[in-house]
Design a protein with these regions (language model features):
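Short, acidic loop-to-helix structural element flanking the phosphoryl-transfer center
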Residues: 1-6, 46
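Asp-based, Mg2+/Mn2+-dependent phosphohydrolase catalytic module
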Residues: 9-122
């Protein structure tokens, strides 16, 4: 994680989403998890992102949000003050009424390069 905090903001039921995360073996890699079912509203509402910011103890302006859904992830995180990164996965739709991202990637393997660019690390 390049010495940075890592959080997951996800829509859905608490138990279902936690089971998914356990199956993906995220234990030890993630600092905080926010599940919309616990917050009472789903992304793209800004509340789940605000809760994550509070849990991490960082202002949204210092947070990068990586997601594959143009509305829930890109637009939701942008409205909450995060810097969004869109992962252009197969099956995603185009941005129609949503402003394009400054950062767009084809795979999550490109994220460290974006982090270095944002933080001006060679």
């Amino acid at each position: 994680t390049m010495g940075m905090k890592l959080g997951i903001v996800t829509n859905g039921d608490h138990d279902l989403q936690m089971n998914k995360l356990r199956l993906l073996n995220f234990d030890g890699f993630v600092d905080e998890i926010v599940i919309s079912g616990d917050v009472g509203v789903q992304k793209p509402d800004t509340k789940p992102f605000e809760v994550m910011s509070e849990k991490l103890g960082l202002p949204p302006s210092e947070l990068l949000y990586v997601g594959d859904n143009p509305l829930n992830d890109v637009e939701g995180s942008r409205k909450a003050g995060y810097t969004p990164v869109w992962v252009k996965t197969i099956g995603n739709w185009c941005f129609e009424d949503i402003e394009r991202c400054e950062y767009e990637v084809d795979t999550v393997a490109e994220i460290p390069e974006i982090v270095r660019k944002i933080n001006k690390i060679p």
